Amino acid sequence: KPEGSLHELTPVWLASRPLAALRERHPFDSRAVDDVVYGCVVPVGEQGGNIARMAVLQADYDPCVPALQINRYCGSGLEAVAFAAAKVMAGQADLTIGGGVEMMSRVPMGSDGGAWAQDPQLASKTSFVMQGISADLLASLRGHSRADLDAYSAHSHRRAARAWAEGRFGRSVVPVKDFLGLELLAHDETIRADTSAASL
């Protein structure tokens, strides 16, 4: 978000942090990495030019480490992890890294000018609708009331806050620092422990 803790960072810097943290937690020679695969939905501007490759270089991996960026819209990061794993499973690689990056505060959705969301004739071929409308439609079709969903959301926030407090995310979260080493973000800033169904 524009006023969030990460808004001053570039997408390349953010994408490089997990790669750097991986070597800090598990020291290894980066030349052993056969491929790095990153997902990115809007690979233009600061996220353009094969952001996976830029992240590899920014993380100070050996320049020989290859990388590629893929786009499967909202599933891009997950698809990148699956793609990286598939290369190992198929015997095409011994060591791969998969992940993803998207900084909508710096590269907003639609910045690529893609036809699917902007060309009504093309969008009509798949009944393209934005996520908010799609979520409302699915909730209506499946009989989920607003009250039920708000109650579930509030409960989810409380559970997430408790999990943070108990340190359950410690192994999977990396504090994000800027290039000077100043810590900008160490925990998820979107969890609201004090939220309620009424406030939602």
Which residues does each PLM region occupy?
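Active-site-proximal alpha-helical scaffold in enzymes
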Residues: R72-V101, A139-F169
